[in-house]
A protein has these predicted regions:
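C-terminal interaction module
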Residues: 1-45, 126-224
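Non-transmembrane, amphipathic alpha-helical segments
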Residues: 82, 86, 201-204
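Noncatalytic linker/hinge segments flanking ATPase motor cores
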Residues: 49-57, 119-124, 163-170
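Short amphipathic beta-strand starts and helix->beta connectors
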Residues: 61-66, 101-107, 183
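Glycine-rich, often proline-containing surface loops adjacent to acidic residues and nearby aromatics
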Residues: 3-14, 67-84, 113-122, 191-194
């Protein structure tokens, strides 16, 4: 079984207009209550073209680190250190809080258009980095190391560094749009190439993230 470390789960919850009680949340007493509940190091409010955003970073809820929380008029962006269960638990606590501070209790049964997820992690695989690109390309690049040297006293080496793909979406509904997401499977920066430690970012929740990586390793001829 693969050992996923440094996992971060992120989600964007997109709501119909006038669902989120942002005006209520911007009240000092409610902001302070939220800051206390999540042990945030600080909360700030930004205004851009008459649109307010509440931004909080680095907190904790029930032992789960919360990396970021951003709330605007129609969406909640939440990132926690952990898996989908940790993310969902944090969201539910937030949703109940937003329900309680709103006399209309709109977040009790919110009109949620869609939720998009992202998960990142580091994981050791039995796949050499070079296997991610065509052998012809690696052979060509390595044949040019002499001309890539800045001077005769240096030795140039070429290693794979970054590898990302863009995932585009076309929603079935026309009331909202989705921005493209990034799918990344690349060498983890600062690690020994011999260890084959990868940084992986997928536009999915953590369960699918794990499944994609496991199937990727099998497809690339790793551990059977």
């Amino acid at each position: 079984m693969l050992d996923f470390v440094d996992m971060v789960s992120m989600a964007r919850y997109l709501f119909a207009p006038n669902t989120l009680p942002l005006t209520n949340l911007l009240m000092n007493s409610h902001r302070k209550a939220l800051e206390t509940m999540f042990s945030f190091q600080g909360i700030q409010v930004d205004a851009d073209v008459n649109q307010f955003r509440l931004i909080a970073g680095m907190g904790e809820l029930n032992g789960v680190p919360v990396q970021q929380l951003v709330i605007d008029a129609v969406s909640i962006n939440l990132a926690v250190v952990g898996d989908y269960a940790d993310l969902n638990n944090s969201y539910e606590v937030l949703r109940k809080f937003l329900t309680e501070i709103d006399s209309k209790r709109r977040m009790e049964n919110p009109k949620l258009y869609t939720t998009t997820y992202q998960t990142q992690s580091s994981v050791k695989l039995t796949i050499p980095y070079e296997r991610l690109v065509a052998p012809e390309l690696m052979n060509f690049l390595r044949s040019k190391t002499d001309v890539l040297r800045p001077n005769d006293s240096s030795v140039a080496e070429i290693h794979l560094s970054n590898l990302s793909f863009q995932v585009k979406y076309t929603p079935n509904a026309e009331v909202y749009s989705l921005v493209p997401k990034v799918l990344t499977i690349e060498p983890r920066a600062g690690t020994d190439p011999k260890e084959s430690t990868y940084y992986v970012l997928t536009p999915t929740a953590s369960d699918t993230h794990r499944l994609i990586v496991e199937e990727f390793e099998k497809a690339m001829g790793g551990v059977k």
